[in-house]
A protein has these predicted regions:
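Short alpha-helical segment of the dimerization/phosphotransfer core of two-component systems
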Residues: 23-28
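A conserved beta-strand-to-alpha-helix junction within the catalytic ATP-binding
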Residues: 49-67
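Acidic ATP/Mg2+-coordinating residue in the GHKL
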Residues: 132
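Short conserved segment of the HATPase_c
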Residues: 137-149
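Conserved catalytic submotifs in the C-terminal HATPase_c
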Residues: 49-53, 71, 76-86
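Short helix-loop "hinge" at the ATP-lid/N-box region of the Bergerat-fold HATPase_c
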Residues: 105-107
Length: 199
């Protein structure tokens, strides 16, 4: 920006400088927001509102918001959510954040061409599976991906902030559920969330 202010760059080069600066500002804002969320979670200051809602409808609404973004990234998608009602107690904001973080992780890191979300349910629990066909995660990285600030790509150019998956895990735990990951390098990654029907 100093180069722009001092008129060292002009025209198309100036526009590119401004575009890069705006992108970095957006990433910084996103990082601060996510970091603030993690701090509140870590300190036990996050307030949750558990309400009875239809998990299937909520999942459909979340995915409907994601479809344009997936299409803009040339990702094909497969969404399998039962048409039946599945009433359970969840914090809808937290559940939305869980799915958003998993899908954002795929967009940012996986280099995938396909993503899927599958919801299946029993009387006792709901199973939500988010999968991609991307580059996968190495066996050495896999045990650590839910740790705070952990990034599989250790280069300085690594995208993301290393908080998305750890926040997702914390939010799943708040629902007394579990989240696991399985991955085959070069073939893709599968995240499986198990949520009990009754909290």
């Amino acid at each position: 920006l100093e180069a722009v202010e001092s008129k060292m760059v002009t025209g198309a080069e100036q526009e590119e400088y401004i575009r890069v600066a705006a992108e970095k500002a957006h990433h910084l804002k996103e990082f601060v927001t996510v970091l603030f969320e993690w701090v509140k979670l870590d300190a036990g200051e996050q307030i949750f509102h558990f309400e009875l809602c239809d998990l299937n409808e909520l999942s459909r609404n979340i995915m409907a918001d994601w479809v344009p973004l997936l299409e803009s990234h040339d990702l094909t998608y497969e969404i399998e959510i039962p048409e039946t009602e599945y009433m359970t107690r969840v914090d809808s904001t937290a559940y939305t954040r869980i799915l958003n973080n998993l899908l954002q992780n795929i967009l940012t890191h996986s280099v995938a061409s396909q993503v899927s979300l599958t919801v299946t349910e029993t009387e006792q629990q709901a199973k939500i599976v988010v999968a991609d066909n991307g580059k996968g995660i190495s066996a050495s990285d896999l045990p650590h991906i839910f740790e705070r600030m952990y990034q599989c790509d250790h280069s300085r150019a690594a995208k993301g902030n290393g908080l998305g998956l750890s926040i997702a895990k914390e939010l799943v735990s708040v629902h007394k559920g579990t989240i696991t990951a399985a991955s085959i390098p070069g073939a893709g990654t599968t995240f499986t969330i198990m949520l009990p029907k009754a909290l």
